Amino acid sequence: MTSLRPTRDVCMIKIDGLTKIFGEGAEAFTALDDVSLTIQSNEFFTLLGPSGCGKTTLLRMIAGFLDPTRGQLMLDGKDLLRHPPHQRPVNTVFQSYALFPHMTVSENIAFGLQMLKRPKAEIAATVSEMLELVQMTAMADRKTAQISGGQQQRVALARALAPRPKVLLLDEPLSALDFKLRKEMQLELKRLQHETGITFVFVTHDQEEALTMSDRIAVMNAGTIRQIGGPRDIYDHPAERFVADFIGDTNFLKAQMVSSTESGALVRLASGEEILAKAPEGGAHSAGQAVTLAVRPEHARLCERTDALLIGTLDNVVYFGTDTHYHVTMEGGGTFILRRQNQPGQTQTLAINDTVGVCFAPDTAQILKD
């Protein structure tokens, strides 16, 4: 497939105040609450959030399977709400691939093109191109029941890409795959998006999928968007406690504001230690105010008690192969988790119930909005 490679500063999807309310009166439920965002051309954009957050509802409205209660939805400068699903330049790949078992791989890929009444020569050329794109040429004449789950996923993608939609919608398409195959398909999806230049809108509750594949992520909760940003920005600079808690592992520490500076905020930990932490943009805190600090497990280390910011008791040590997690019960309550990457020849010298110190660079601690 020839990629047009549109620049990312061109808006493909513009959503303004989109709301979806199911039911009426006392039984009314707001699944999507005044959502606004833009998705650029040639972007891999992910809607990430827990079950029931509204991400699939939003995807279904883009596809045309649901009508919004109110709001505006534009695609490539045109009002999408005026068009039924079959007239929208989008295709959808679902969790269940919905392949036709009585058809071959090639026939499945050709089906949508046949429904669009494309010329036979064009269909044959496009099917061949799609088979090569998803690396399934050798399986062209097999029935879909004779191929693996990962191969079925590739066929579903090829069928959706064949009509050359402007936008491809993907509704948790990897959730049925095993762990190893899911990781392989993450790389495959990103490759396909890059090679085709088509805008991908991907829905998932899996943070690893979102961080691995996305150009940008919209983190959703309770029908609203809590933060939009690149994977590194979302992970390193969560806008609020929900985002910090949902994306990766995070330790939350109670602290008290001492003063604000140009480079951050001086806070006092429960241990009495004062550190200069990162403050959220636009956040205003007064001296004496209680605040919450977020510290990622990989940013902390065990250290001598004399150098420690926090003191606690080693409660558990969990080996994960590539790294080891240390669970420390802090003086005053609460658990702090540290992550250390394992190295060849590394030995474990600590024992459960040992008193340990916890250190972290102050600039890795971030004050969160509640």
UniProtKB/Swiss-Prot annotation:
Protein task: Part of the ABC transporter complex PotABCD involved in spermidine/putrescine import. Responsible for energy coupling to the transport system.
EC code: 7.6.2.11
Alphabetically ordered keywords of this record: ATP-binding, Cell inner membrane, Cell membrane, Membrane, Nucleotide-binding, Translocase, Transport
A single Gene Ontology CC term: ATP-binding cassette (ABC) transporter complex
Protein name, entry field: Spermidine/putrescine import ATP-binding protein PotA
Entry's family note: Belongs to the ABC transporter superfamily. Spermidine/putrescine importer (TC 3.A.1.11.1) family.
Subunit structure: The complex is composed of two ATP-binding proteins (PotA), two transmembrane proteins (PotB and PotC) and a solute-binding protein (PotD).
EC class name: translocase
PANTHER family the record matches: SPERMIDINE/PUTRESCINE IMPORT ATP-BINDING PROTEIN POTA (PTHR42781), SPERMIDINE_PUTRESCINE IMPORT ATP-BINDING PROTEIN POTA (PTHR42781:SF4)
Span of domain ABC transporter: 13-247
Keyword Ubl conjugation: no
Cross-referenced NCBIfam families: potA (TIGR01187)
Compartment(s) where it occurs, according to its Swiss-Prot or TrEMBL record: Cell inner membrane
Keyword hit for Translocase: yes
Membrane-topology annotation of the record: Peripheral membrane protein
InterPro entries found in the cross-reference section: AAA+_ATPase, ABC_SmlMolc_Importer, ABC_transporter-like_ATP-bd, ABC_transporter-like_CS, Mo/tungstate-bd_C_term_dom, NA-bd_OB-fold, P-loop_NTPase, PotA-like
Catalytic activity: ATP + H2O + polyamine-[polyamine-binding protein]Side 1 = ADP + phosphate + polyamineSide 2 + [polyamine-binding protein]Side 1
Family matches, as PROSITE patterns: ABC_TRANSPORTER_1, ABC_TRANSPORTER_2, POTA
SMART domains, per the entry: AAA
Superkingdom to which the source organism belongs: Bacteria
